[in-house]
From Swiss-Prot:
Organism field: Acidovorax ebreus (strain TPSY) (Diaphorobacter sp. (strain TPSY))
Cysteines paired by S-S bonds: none
Organism domain of life: Bacteria
Chain's gene name: rbfA
Molecular-function annotations in GO: ribosomal small subunit binding
RNA-binding among keywords: no
Subcellular location: Cytoplasm
Protein name per the record: Ribosome-binding factor A
Gene Ontology CC terms, in alphabetical order: cytosol
Amino acid sequence: MAAKKSSSPNRGFKVADQIQRDLTELIRDLKDPRIGMVTLQGVEVTPDYAHAKVFFSVLIGDGEASEEALNQAGGFLRNGLFKRLHIHTVPTLHFVYDRTTEKAADMNALIARAVASRSKDDDAA
């Protein structure tokens, strides 16, 4: 017997997007001082909706401390999602600190230094 296909192939993306929007509001209401200015970058939900990886970056604050605090608050946040989402299974949340913005800033700094040293070399020649 063939596996039953989902009636809406984009449903997983829609659920992930709604989770991201709702979590943004719920995290804003958290009072934990370890959580800095967090920006949710994306959410990946497993096909059975049992787990969700939530990728975030931090503008101000410590990323690792924020990750620990968010994972500790995961049950509270999941309960908040349960009240907002109208799906049978609300996923267990796994927060992952996304270092992409840090790496991009480091790469930009390296490029700027290389360009500056090259222009100094051209001026000396």
